[in-house]
C-alpha cells in the first residue's frame, strides 16, 4: 500500500499545447502503473523537469484540465553536500515550470520535424512535403494540429534559414 501511495506521488501534471502533449506521449515510454510519461535520464528534458521540481506550498495552485502527466525523475546524488530531490516530496511543477517544459518539448518537436523535412529536400524530394507531414502526423498520432499548420511552420523556418533576396535589376544603357 505504501508503495502505491509513493508511486502516485511521483507524478505531476501540467498543461501544455495539445499537439505537444500528444507528441511527447507517443514519443516516450508511458509508465504503466501511474500513466505518466517516463523521461529517459539521457535527455535534456529530464534535467529541465528535475530542475523545475519543487516542494508544494500550502497555498499552491492545483492545475485543472492538465493534459500531460509526467513521471518525475529520481536523481539521488551520493556525493556529500549535493542532496537529491525525492519525487515523493518534490512533486510540484509551477506554471512557470510548465512553460519551460513546454518550450523544451516544442524545441524537440520542431527539431525532429524540421530535420525530416530538410532531409527530404536534401535527398531530392523523393516524397512530396505533404506526404512527409502526413507520415510525421501518423507516426505520432497527432490529432490536434493540421498538416497545413505544420507545412506553414516549416516554410517559415526555411525562409529564416535561407532568406530569398530579391534580384537587383539594372537598366541597360544603350550601346
Language-model segments: what does each one mean?
Residues 102-125:
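Positively charged, polyanion-binding regions of nucleic-acid-associated proteins
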Residues 135-151:
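Short, basic interhelical loop/turn and adjoining N-cap
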Amino acid at each position: 500500500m505504501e508503495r502505491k501511495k509513493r508511486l502516485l506521488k511521483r507524478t505531476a501534471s501540467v498543461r501544455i499545447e495539445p499537439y505537444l502533449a500528444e507528441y511527447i506521449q507517443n514519443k516516450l515510454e508511458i509508465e504503466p502503473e501511474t500513466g505518466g510519461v517516463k523521461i529517459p535520464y539521457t535527455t535534456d528534458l529530464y534535467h529541465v523537469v528535475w530542475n523545475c521540481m519543487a516542494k508544494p506550498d500550502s497555498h499552491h495552485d492545483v492545475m485543472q484540465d492538465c493534459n500531460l502527466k509526467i513521471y518525475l525523475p529520481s536523481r539521488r546524488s551520493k556525493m556529500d553536500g549535493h542532496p537529491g530531490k525525492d519525487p515523493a516530496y518534490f512533486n510540484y511543477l509551477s506554471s512557470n515550470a510548465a512553460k519551460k517544459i513546454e518550450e523544451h518539448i516544442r524545441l524537440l518537436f520542431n527539431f525532429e520535424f524540421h530535420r525530416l523535412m530538410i532531409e527530404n529536400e536534401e535527398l531530392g524530394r523523393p516524397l512530396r512535403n505533404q506526404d512527409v507531414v502526413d507520415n510525421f502526423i501518423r507516426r505520432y498520432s497527432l490529432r490536434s494540429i493540421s498538416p497545413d499548420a505544420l507545412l506553414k511552420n516549416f516554410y517559415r523556418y526555411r525562409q529564416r534559414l535561407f532568406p530569398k533576396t530579391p534580384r537587383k535589376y539594372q537598366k541597360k544603357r544603350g550601346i
